[in-house]
Amino acid sequence: MKKTALLAALCSVVSLSSCCRIVDCCFEDPCAPIQCSPCESKKKDVDGGCNSCNGYVPACKPCGGDTHQDAEHGPQAREIPVDGKCRQ
């Protein structure tokens, strides 16, 4: 019982410290096409793991990758500042 409680506490601390900024940005990938919403897709696909980010990993492809070629890409597509910081 103690191990379970300790593991749950550890998971919540680690996930909060590592994912707060991602959660604040609603899992938005600044380089993703405007019509893509990683946040919405991950809300529906919860893996139940020890990770408040639900396993979301930002896209590895550079801005303007091979998907949705006609969509606007880049931080400015989501009105994100050039420095990449989240809007408050």
UniProtKB/Swiss-Prot annotation:
Subcellular location: Cell outer membrane
InterPro entries documented for this protein: Cys-rich_OMP3_Chlamydia
Chief localisation class: membrane
Name this polypeptide is given: Small cysteine-rich outer membrane protein OmcA
Sequence segments annotated as region (Disordered): 67-88
Subunit structure: Part of a disulfide cross-linked outer membrane complex (COMC) composed of the major outer membrane porin (MOMP), the small cysteine-rich protein (OmcA) and the large cysteine-rich periplasmic protein (OmcB).
Pfam families: Chlam_OMP3
GO cellular component: cell outer membrane
GO molecular function: extracellular matrix structural constituent
Residues with a covalently attached lipid (S-diacylglycerol cysteine): 19
Lipid addition sites, N-palmitoyl cysteine: 19
Extent of the signal sequence: 1-18
A GO biological-process term: regulation of cell shape
Membrane topology designation: Lipid-anchor
Record function comment: In elementary bodies (EBs, the infectious stage, which is able to survive outside the host cell) provides the structural integrity of the outer envelope through disulfide cross-links with the large cysteine-rich periplasmic protein and the major outer membrane porin. It has been described in publications as the Sarkosyl-insoluble COMC (Chlamydia outer membrane complex), and serves as the functional equivalent of peptidoglycan.
This protein's record includes keyword Secreted: no
Keywords: Cell outer membrane, Cell shape, Disulfide bond, Lipoprotein, Membrane, Palmitate, Signal
Ranges annotated as spanning the membrane: none
